[in-house]
C-alpha cells in the first residue's frame, strides 16, 4: 500500500502517502554489468550501481555494499531497487554479485557451486572486493558485505574465513 494510516479504535484515517510520485531518476540506482576473473579462470558477474546523488559526491572512491542473493542458485537482475537506491543516493556504491552457481549464465556456471557451496561463493565474494578496488569503483577499506538466506550464509563464511576484507557484514 502507498498509505500510512492511523487507527483510533473506531476510524481509519490516511495520515500520509508513503511514496513520492515524482522521484527524480538521478537519485535512483542505475545498474550496469561488471565482471572479473575467478581463480579458476572463469568470469564472475555482478550488477554495479555507482552513487546516485547529483548534489553530493564522495571525496575519493565511495564506500560500497556488496550484496549476495539467496538461493543459492537464484540471481540478481537489473531492475528498480528501492534498497539499492536508498544507499546509492546517500553516496554508497552497490554491487549485487551473481556468484558462480547463479542462474542465467548457462549450465556450467550454474553447476559450479555443486558440492562446493561455501567455497566458490566465498571466492567470488573476495573477487568482488578485489574487482571493486582494481576497477576503481569503490574504496577497498570501506566495504560492507550483506545478504539474506543463502546469501547470509556466504556473508558469514566470508567474514569468518577472511576477516579484514570487509569492514562489516549484514
Where do the protein language model's features map onto the residues?
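Structural motif
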Residues: 2-6
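Short loop/turn segments that connect beta-strands within beta-propeller blades
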Residues: 8-10
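Residues forming the Rossmann-fold NAD(P)(H) cofactor-binding site
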Residues: 152
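A conserved short beta-strand
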Residues: 164-170
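Cap/lid segment of the alpha/beta-hydrolase catalytic domain
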Residues: 18-141, 146-149, 157, 161
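Proline-centered flexible-loop/turn and helix-kink motifs
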Residues: 1, 163-164
Amino acid at each position: 500500500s502507498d498509505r500510512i494510516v492511523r487507527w483510533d479504535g473506531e476510524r481509519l484515517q490516511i495520515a500520509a502517502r508513503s511514496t513520492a510520485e515524482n522521484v527524480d531518476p538521478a537519485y535512483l540506482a542505475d545498474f550496469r554489468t561488471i565482471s572479473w576473473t575467478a581463480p579458476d579462470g572463469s568470469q564472475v558477474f555482478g550488477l554495479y550501481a555507482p552513487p546516485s546523488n547529483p548534489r553530493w559526491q564522495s571525496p575519493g572512491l565511495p564506500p560500497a555494499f556488496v550484496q549476495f542473493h539467496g538461493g543459492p542458485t537464484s540471481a540478481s537482475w537489473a531492475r528498480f531497487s528501492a534498497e539499492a537506491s536508498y544507499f546509492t543516493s546517500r553516496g554508497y556504491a552497490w554491487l549485487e554479485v551473481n556468484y558462480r552457481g547463479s542462474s542465467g549464465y548457462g549450465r556450467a556456471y550454474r553447476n559450479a557451486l555443486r558440492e562446493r557451496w561455501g567455497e566458490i561463493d566465498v571466492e567470488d565474494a573476495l573477487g568482488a572486493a578485489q574487482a571493486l578496488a582494481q576497477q576503481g569503483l569503490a574504496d577497498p577499506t570501506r566495504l560492507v558485505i550483506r545478504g539474506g538466506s543463502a546469501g547470509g550464509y556466504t556473508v558469514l563464511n566470508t567474514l569468518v574465513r577472511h576477516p579484514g576484507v570487509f569492514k562489516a557484514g549484514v
